[in-house]
Amino acid sequence: MYKKLKLTTISELIKNIYCSLSVLIIGCASAYAVEFNKDLIEAEDRENVNLSQFETDGQLPVGKYSLNALINNKRTPIHLDLQWVLIDNQTAVCLTPEQLTLLGFTDEIIEVAQQNLIDGCYPIEKEKQITTYLDKGKMQLSISAPQAWLKYKDANWTPPELWDHGIAGAFLDYNLYASHYAPHQGDNSQNISSYGQAGVNLGAWRLRTDYQYDQSFNNGKSQANNLDFPRIYLFRPIPAINAKLTIGQYDTESSIFDSFHFSGVSLKSDENMLPPDLRGYAPQITGVAQTNAKVTVSQNNRIIYQENVPPGPFAITNLFNTLQGQLDVKVEEEDGQVTQWQVASNSIPYLTRKGQIRYTTAMGKPTSVGGDSLQQPFFWTGEFSWGWLNNVSLYGGSVLTNRDYQSLAAGVGFNLNSLGSLSFDVTRSDAQLHNQDKETGYSYRANYSKRFESTGSQLTFAGYRFSDKNFVTMNEYINDTNHYTNYQNEKESYIVTFNQYLESLRLNTYVSLARNTYWDASSNVNYSLSLSRDFDIGPSKNVSTSLTFSRINWEEDNQDQLYLNISIPWGTSRTLSYGMQRNQDNKISHTASWYDSSDRNNSWSVSASGDNDEFKDMKASLRASYQHNTENGRLYLSGTSQRDSYYSLNASWNGSFTATRHGAAFHDYSGSADSRFMIDADGAEDIPLNNKRAVTNRYGIGVIPSVSSYITTSLSVDTRNLPENVDIENSVITTTLTEGAIGYAKLDTRKGYQIMGVIRLADGSHPPLGISVKDKTIHKELGLVADGGFVYLNGIQDDSKLTLRWGDKSCFIQPPNSSNLTTGTVILPCISQN
C-alpha cells in the first residue's frame, strides 16, 4: 500500500513551488498585472510553460466565482457568488445591491450603487476609499471600507443580514440517571430518571418539548413512575424587530412579576440580537453535599438544571440569565436524605441604553406543568424598559385578567456611575380571593449593584422587596382560585451578595445572605460565608484552602454546615485533598481523596470519609468515581460502600442525537438553548472537528454541539490528525446561527490515495509548467504540474480519470490502481486527446 505523504512534506513541496514562481515576477507588487520571465525557469523547454493563471494580481477572468469574503478583516459567515466584469481592459469585482446589504454597507452606499449598476452589479473599487485584495489560493476576497460606510460598528457582532436559520432537522438532548441503594438491613431501592428536550426545526421555526421521567423501585419492584412534558411550544426569531415569538406551553419571562406557566403566545425582545449590552443576571447557587449527591434546580416543577456532585461544597454558576423568580433547589444524598431551599433569581437594576426599548408581552391561560388547564381567566401581561436618558431608564408593566385580578407596576433605574446602579419600583395589585372582598395591595422593590474597581469587590443588593398584607401576586391568585392553600403570603425578602479578592494575599471572600418573612408564617434566613486562599508549600505550588460556613433555614428547621478543605496539586493533573465537615448534629467527619485527570477523556477519584469512631472501627465510607468523555456524550459512574451500613451505585450518561436530510449522528450534549452545527465530510469517517469536540461517524456526519447564537463562530477541522488518505480543502467554517438552529456545511473532502509522479506525453516530453490536473469524474483539481512534469496528486480513487488542458491541447491519465502502487516516483503516461 502506498503510504500517505506527511502533510509537512506536502506543505513544503507546495511552498517551494509557489516560492519559485514568485521570484519570476517582474514589476512592483501593486501592479494590476505582471509577466513571468520564462528565461529564468530552469526547464528543458522554456516555451513549454503555461503560467497565465498566475499573471494577474487581484483579478480573475470575466465570470462568476464563489468566494469567502472579509470586510475590514472580519470574516463573513457566508459564501458569495461574486462577478468579475471588464472595466478599462481589466477585470474588477462587481457586487449586487443585495450583496452590499449582506456585507453591511449603509443605505446611502447601496443607493449610489443602484444608480451606477453595470450588468446588475456595482464595481465597488470605483469608490476610491474602498480597496480589495483577492487571495486566489484561498479564493478569498478582502474588502477594506471606511467604517462610516458600514451600518454596524461593533466588530464582535454580526448583523442580521448574515444570520443563518440553519436547515430542517430533529434532535434529542437527553440526560439519563440510575441509582441503586442497598442498606445492610432493610429493603433495597432503585431509581431511574431522565430529563431533556426534543425538537424539530423547519426554516426559522423551532418546535420544542421538554420531558422528565422518574421511576422508583423497591427490591426491584416498581413503586411509582412519572412521565411529564412540562412544555410543548413553537418559537422563532424575528430579526426585523429584534424579538422572539413563542406559541404554546411556556413560562412568562419577567423582571418585575413572578413567573408562571401558561398556554398562549408571547413576544419578547431579545437583547442577544443587539450589539453587546446588559446581558441580565442569574444567581449563583451554593451548598454543601454530605455524600455523592444529585442537585436539582427547578422552577414551576420544571427541571432547569441537574448535576451529580461529590461530597463537599458545590457551586452552580452556569444558569441561564433568562431565569426570573423563585428557584427550587433540592439536594438528594445517596442515603436518601433530602435538603431543600429556595433561591430568588431577581434581575439587577433594569437599565437600558438611551433611546432603546426592551419589552416582553404574553397572553393566554395559566396552566399547570404538563398542560392541564386550571380554573383561570384569560390574561395579558406586558412590561418594558425605556432608556430615557443616558443614565436613567423608565420601566413598568402590568398583568391584566378578564376577572378578579389586575396588577400594575412602574419603576426607574439609575446608572450612578462611580456609585453603582440602582433601581426602584412599585407594584399595585387588585384581587379578590376566595370568600374574601376585593383588596388593593402594594409591593415596593429596590435593587443595587456596585463594583469597587480599586479593591476588586462586587456588592449586589438584589431584590429587596416589601409587600403589604393585601398584596397578591399572580401565582398566589392562581393557587387560591384552584384551592391550593399551601402558599405563603410574603412580607419582606432580600438578597445580599459580596465578593472580594485580595490579590496580595491570594484570598477570595464570598458572602451571601437571603431573608424571607411572611405575614402568615415564620421567617427564614439563609446565608453562607466562604474564604479561599492559594499559597505555596515548598515545591508544591498553588495549594488551595477553603473554609465554608452555611445555614439553610427551611420550614422552621435550621441546617448549619461547616466545611474545611485543603487541596495539594500533584503535578499538573492530579490532586490530593483533605476535607473536614461539621453538620447540624455537630458531628465532625473527615474526607481524604485523590483525583486524577491526566487523561483528558478519562478522570477518576477515590476517597474515604467518616468520623473519628468510623475510622477507628474501620467503617469509613469508601467512594470511587469515574468519568469518561466521548464525542457522543459523557459517562459518569460512582459507588460508595460502608461496612455494616450500606452500599450504593450511581450512573449517568448525557448526550444528544441530531438528524437531518443529510444524515444523522450521536454527539456530545448540546444545551436546549444552544444551536448545533452538522458537518458533512462526504462519507469520510473519523474526521476530528473543533479540537476533537466531535468526530464524523461511519457515514461522514459529525455534529458540533453548543454553538453560540448570534455570534460569529469559527468551526475547524483538525487537519493534523486526519485519517489516512483523506485531505480537507475548506478546513475552517465561519457561521452565525440564530437561536436553536441546526447549521450545516459540506466539506470539500478528498478521499483517496496520493501519487508522487512524473507526467510524460507520448513523445517523451512533459506538459507545460503550471497546468492543472483535474479529476474528470468529480470535477476537482488534484494538483499542478511542476518542472519536468513532476506532480503531486492527492485524493485519487481507483476509478479516477485525470485530464490536463493547455491551449488547444489536452490529454488524459489513467492512474495506477491503489493495490498496484509502489513507493517512489511513478511514471504517469498522458494520452493525447487531440
Enumerate the language-model features and the residues they cover:
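Short, acidic Ser/Thr/Gly-rich low-complexity loop/linker segments typical of extracellular
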Residues: 81, 692-701, 778-790
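Short, ordered, surface-exposed loop/turn motifs in non-cytosolic proteins
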Residues: 60-83, 293, 683-693, 762-777
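A short, amphipathic beta-strand motif
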Residues: 69, 285-287, 676-681, 753-761
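Transmembrane beta-strands of outer-membrane beta-barrel pores
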Residues: 149, 178-182, 204, 213-217, ...
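Post-signal-peptide, soluble extracytosolic/periplasmic N-terminal scaffold domains
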Residues: 23, 27, 31-279, 584-658
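Feature captures outer-membrane beta-barrel proteins of Gram-negative bacteria and organelles
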Residues: 162-164, 192-204, 226-239, 376-398, ...
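Conserved, compact domain cores that house catalytic/ligand-binding motifs in diverse enzymes
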Residues: 95, 162-219, 357-430, 453, ...
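Short Pro-Gly-centered beta-turn/loop motif in secreted/extracellular proteins
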Residues: 86-95, 317-324, 701-727, 738-739, ...
